[in-house]
A protein has these predicted regions:
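Short beta-strand/loop motif that positions the catalytic acidic residue
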Residues: 75, 81-83
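Short alpha-helix in the alpha/beta-hydrolase fold that links the catalytic acid
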Residues: 67-68, 90-103
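Second-shell loop/turn segments in exported
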Residues: 1-5, 86, 130-135
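Alpha/beta-hydrolase active-site loop
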Residues: 2-21
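Acidic catalytic loop of the alpha/beta-hydrolase fold
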Residues: 61, 85-92
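Primarily recognizes the serine-hydrolase "nucleophile elbow" in alpha/beta-hydrolase
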Residues: 17-74
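C-terminal catalytic histidine-bearing segment of alpha/beta-hydrolase fold enzymes
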Residues: 109-154
Length: 154
């Protein structure tokens, strides 16, 4: 369970370990089901991270732990939401992504980017070799994230 206390304790330990190794701002980046974890961490481990990046977010309101169903108003760090316009995963429909931004009422900076690059998707639409994983444009997506983290703006 990605919003359980046990999972959050694990995330706390990872954050503490990274901070011990490097004196730099630490961001959490979650992809797909990892967005559930990253969102829960931003809500419950406040002060432990500089910001959050959510890619290919679980947005389906059918899932109790979906990103838009969590207490997004409790997040008080910058948030980037990156999603592929052609993501066909049933839990990650692009049309539901704006619900995340609407919920981030107290994030000082929040940005939604709908991405359209890439090529040659194959296999399961919810896996990394499809639009869900920014297939054919992974480097471009990572560069976009890294550049935004360096200079987060709305």
């Amino acid at each position: 369970d990605r919003i359980s206390d046990t999972h959050l304790i694990d995330l706390h330990k990872v954050l503490a370990f990274v901070k011990q190794k490097a004196d730099v701002p630490v961001w959490i980046v979650g992809t797909s089901r990892g967005t559930v974890s990253a969102t829960a961490a931003a809500i419950k481990l406040q002060g432990e991270m500089a910001g959050v990046v959510l890619t290919s977010s679980v947005v389906s309101f059918k899932k109790p732990e979906a990103v838009p169903r969590q207490d997004l108003a409790a997040i008080k760090v910058p948030v980037l939401v990156l999603h592929h316009t052609k993501d066909a995963c049933h839990l990650c429909q692009p049309s539901e992504v704006p619900a995340i931004l609407r919920g981030l009422k107290n994030a000082p900076i929040k940005k939604e980017i709908m991405f359209s690059g890439g090529a040659n998707p194959s296999g399961n639409v919810c896996n990394g070799q499809h639009w869900h994983g920014f297939i054919g444009a992974e480097r471009e997506a990572v560069d976009l994230i890294a550049n935004w983290i360096k200079n987060p703006v709305n």
